Structures are given as structure tokens and as C-alpha cells.
A protein has these predicted regions:
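Conserved active-site alpha-helix within GNAT-family acetyltransferase domains
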Residues: 105, 109, 117, 129-147
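A short beta-loop-alpha structural element at the N-terminal edge
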Residues: 2-16, 25
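Conserved beta-strand-loop-alpha-helix junction that forms the acyl-donor binding cleft
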Residues: 124-134, 151-155
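Conserved GNAT-fold acetyl-CoA-binding loop/helix
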Residues: 22-45
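Conserved GNAT acetyl-CoA-binding A-motif
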Residues: 115-126
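Conserved beta-strand in the GNAT
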Residues: 58, 64-73, 88, 93
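Conserved acetyl-CoA-binding loop-helix of GNAT-fold acetyltransferases
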Residues: 91-94, 100-113, 140
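A short helix-loop-beta-strand connector motif used in the catalytic cores of GNAT acetyltransferases and
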Residues: 43-58, 88
């Protein structure tokens, strides 16, 4: 088991895992998410891999990439906000073939340790309210709601 920075050679597997996430989101919210498509083009993924503010990590099991962790450093600013450095988890995904082996927990713990090493105040992420499994997973990791985004569908 290894968690390491993603490399350009990982792009095909990253895209497969991103497709898994898209399907989960499409099933929960087909009014928002398309049934197919790419979140990032190959060129965009290459650029992300080179961006130190948006690190991407992969989980290798027996030489195969079976999970990923897309992160982003964010800093709050403004007249009423304290300047806080945050590590935001944009995507955390584990291949369905290896779920239940605590790989998600290991990726999350890695993100938490990485955030501490980088001097972050907190670790944050967004999770869709309809994704009850993900909500439970993150609550088990110790996360608590920071705020709620509400919606009323008009059409």
C-alpha cells in the first residue's frame, strides 16, 4: 500500500475513478449531473498535476492505482474573515472493486496529516446531501457540518 503524488501516467485511472463519482452524482441528481462526460480534459489534468496549490494523490495497492485524492489549498480573506489556510478535498474516490478495505479512511487520514504538515487550520470538503453513504463516511472520520447550502428548485 502506497499513497503518492499522482503522475501523468495515472491519468487514465484518474479518469475512470472520476467517472465512478459522476455516476454516483448523476444517480442522485440527474437534474444537475450528466450521465457521461469528463470533469477534466487530459490537458487540464496535466496542468493540475503540475499545480502545487492543487495536489493530487493516488492510493496504490499491489502496484495498481485504486483510489485518488484531489486537494486544493484555499485561504480566506476579507474584512470580516480571519486569514485561514484550508486544505479542501475536491474528490476522494476508491475503486468499487476494493471498497470495504479501509482505503477511503487511509486517504482521509493522509489528507488530514498532509493538511497539518502544510500548516492548515482545517480540512474541508463538499458532500451532496443525497449521498448518505458519503455523509456517514465523513462523519465517522470526525467531520462536522460547517454550513448548509439550501436550494428550492423552481422549474
Amino acid at each position: 500500500m502506497t499513497i503518492r503524488k499522482a503522475r501523468p501516467s495515472d491519468i487514465p485511472v484518474l479518469n475512470e475513478l472520476l467517472q465512478d463519482i459522476l455516476q454516483v452524482h448523476h444517480q442522485a441528481r440527474p437534474d444537475i449531473f450528466k450521465s457521461e462526460g469528463q470533469k477534466f480534459s487530459e490537458a487540464k489534468l496535466v496542468a493540475l498535476l503540475e499545480n502545487p496549490d492543487k495536489p493530487i494523490f493516488v492510493f496504490e495497492l499491489e502496484g495498481q492505482v485504486v483510489g485518488h485524492l484531489f486537494c486544493e489549498f484555499r485561504t480566506t480573506s476579507g474584512d470580516v474573515l480571519e486569514p485561514i489556510k484550508t486544505l479542501f478535498i475536491d474528490d476522494l474516490c476508491v475503486a468499487s472493486s476494493v471498497r470495504g478495505q479501509k482505503i477511503g479512511e487511509q486517504l482521509y487520514e493522509f489528507a488530514l496529516s498532509y493538511a497539518k504538515e502544510q500548516g492548515c487550520h482545517n480540512l474541508t470538503l463538499d458532500v451532496w446531501a443525497d449521498n448518505a453513504g458519503a455523509v456517514r463516511f465523513y462523519e465517522r472520520q470526525g467531520m462536522k457540518p460547517q454550513k448548509f447550502r439550501m436550494e428550492q428548485i423552481i422549474s
